[in-house]
């Protein structure tokens, strides 16, 4: 999960998490592991909600002190390479003007990982194609 550092809507993230849990329970698959980048906003809310629901977390903090401005994109690629997600869920109300979230979405699409973009305009999410 990734998203806007200014995202505050925990209920929408929680709803998405519960939908994923339900989908895995009904359709098989799993286990569900939330991969997040230890950032403010959507990432930290996803981490908090995952802990609340006892969902496994795989965290990738950006190493700003080592890589400066390149730390975010490096972390995003690391989450894809090491975490090997089956799905990326991006929470952002203005994805087109985003930096970090848009970078993660681009990288996921390039890697062939399905992406769902969730916003307040479309809380059910839009599946983005590669």
Model feature map: region roles:
Residues 1-5:
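Short, hydrophobic/glycine-enriched beta-strand segments
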Residues 6-130:
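Acidic/glycine-enriched connector segments
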